[in-house]
Amino acid sequence: MVSNMRSTRTALTGWVGIFLVLSLQQTSCAGLPHNVDTHHILTFNPSPISADGVPLSEVPNSPTTELSTTVATKTAVPTTESTSSSEAHRNSSHKIPDIICDREEVFVFLNNTGRILCDLIVDPPSDDEWSNFALDVTFNPIEYHANEKNVEVARVAGLYGVPGSDYAYPRKSELISSIRRDPQGSFWTSPTPRGNKYFIWINKTMHTMGVEVRNVDYKDNGYFQVILRDRFNRPLVEKHIYMRVCQRPASVDVLAPPVLSGENYKASCIVRHFYPPGSVYVSWRRNGNIATPRKDRDGSFWWFESGRGATLVSTITLGNSGLESPPKVSCLVAWRQGDMISTSNATAVPTVYYHPRISLAFKDGSLQDHRSL
């Protein structure tokens, strides 16, 4: 019996020693010095956001100064049964991260506001595994095909083009915002560029995020790349939402210069201020019959006017027998973006000048009569 009491006292002493060691470890972890490196997401103290279920007016910016973070570690000695049950519960309640947007393609007219709305499928902050996430929103412009001449013209107009390249871009790629959520569920974001151009908001309760692009111009034609990352900055899911900037043609005109009788007719159809390039289709009619246009030698049909979109010129050459009246030349223009279609047309009749015909009459070597027809 004495030996049993000794062994019991020894066992208790051992458990007390273990408890003291664990308590000391917990105390030391709770008092980390300021020079200890921690994960970059946890080194900020995000501004709290009220979860009222209403879209926020804005997401607060991250603090300008780095604040120290206190880390507390809970120590427990779980049994095998409790560990298995907790893992099963975590696996059953775990959500696969995803980004679901209301649409993948948004058409916005020039000078209007474009809006994107997405649902963030993430676990609540109580889940330690996914309590931290990062959301990066990057704008990528859509390139358009052009010959070298048009690329240079685009550069002069203020677009981003590479000399010698066959492509031009509205502008370079740009990180719009970087949003973080800390383990407590609070959000913070880096300041958005371009002043009030972009507006980013987060609904903490509904796990939704939105992007607004104000006063859209042709440089905003591209796609937003939304990447959801874990707390180690590893990408979990990526979504592309295209913003199609568009503008219907402002005017359509046909110019048909005068010609001499027997010379070919020439006409040019000018479609001004539309967007994007390639959204306009031109067809010709001669007295109601289809005629084939002639491209310029360098293949270019359009050019940019800074801040006003693109202008297209299509040229056609028609035969002239000199025996018929001048034809009615019509230009039919169809502008299309997505499900939106707009048509217009213009007509011109070229003026024909005839060569003068002169008759002379001679009698006894002298000019008697002359007239011109």
UniProtKB/Swiss-Prot annotation:
Bias kind Polar residues: ranges: 59-68
InterPro entries listed in its UniProt record: Ig-like_dom, Ig-like_dom_sf, Ig-like_fold, Marek_A
Residues glycosylated per entry: N91, N111, N203, N345
Ranges of residues in domain Ig-like: 249-347
Gene3D superfamilies referenced in this protein's UniProt entry, alphabetically: Immunoglobulins
PROSITE patterns recorded: IG_LIKE (PS50835)
Record carries keyword Glycoprotein: yes
Sorted UniProt keywords: Glycoprotein, Host-virus interaction, Immunoglobulin domain, Signal
Annotated Low complexity bias: 69-80
Record flagged with keyword Cytoplasm: no
Region described as Disordered: spans on this chain: 58-93
Residues annotated as signal peptide: 1-25
Family per similarity comment: Belongs to the herpesviridae glycoprotein C family.
Name assigned to this protein: Envelope glycoprotein C homolog
Organism annotation: Meleagrid herpesvirus 1 (strain FC126)
